[in-house]
Amino acid sequence: MRLKYLFKIQNIIDNEIRRICQEDGSVIDRVYLIKTQILALEVKTGELANITKCYKYPQQMKAVEKRKLIIRYVDCFKFLLSIGNDNQFNVVNFSVKELIESVTKEPCETIVDVFLSLFDHISNLKRDLVTENYISGMGVYMTIFKEFVLIGQLLGLTFEDVFEYYDNIYRDMVHKAEPPAER
C-alpha cells in the first residue's frame, strides 16, 4: 500500500535525524518530542493556510501554483507521518481510497472551516499524546488525517500528486537505507 510506503520513508528520515542528534549527545525526551512535532505540524499547517490566503476577507481565494501547494502540503504531511510513526498509529490499515471516498461523501465545508477544525484536533492530539491516552489519540489522529485529505481535495491536490512529489524527493534516501536484496 502506498501509504505504508510513505510512513516507511518518513521513518527512515526520522531515524537519520535521530542518529545525527545522538551523535551530538542530544537526548530528546518523549513529551518534548511530542510537543515539538505538534508545534511543527501547527506551524506548517499555518504556512499552508497562509499560501492560500483563504483567511483574507472578503477576497476570493486566488489560484496558487500547484507546485507551491504540494510543497507546503507535503511539509505538513511529513510531520503527520512522523507523529503516526512515533506513536504506532502507522499500523492502522486504512485505505487511502476509502479515506478519500469517505471525505467526498461528507457535506462540503469551506477550507477555512477545515483549517479551524484541524487546528482544534491537533491541539486535542497533543493533549492525548502527552497524557498517554493513545486510544483517544488514535481516533483524533485519524480525524486529522481525514481533514488533511479534505484540505488536499479543496486545494485541487490528489493523493497521487502528493505521493509522486514525496517519492521523487526522498526515493534515493530510502534506497540507500534499505539493505541489499538477498539472492
Which role fits each region the language model picked out?
Residues 1-183:
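Flexible "arm" and connector segments at domain edges
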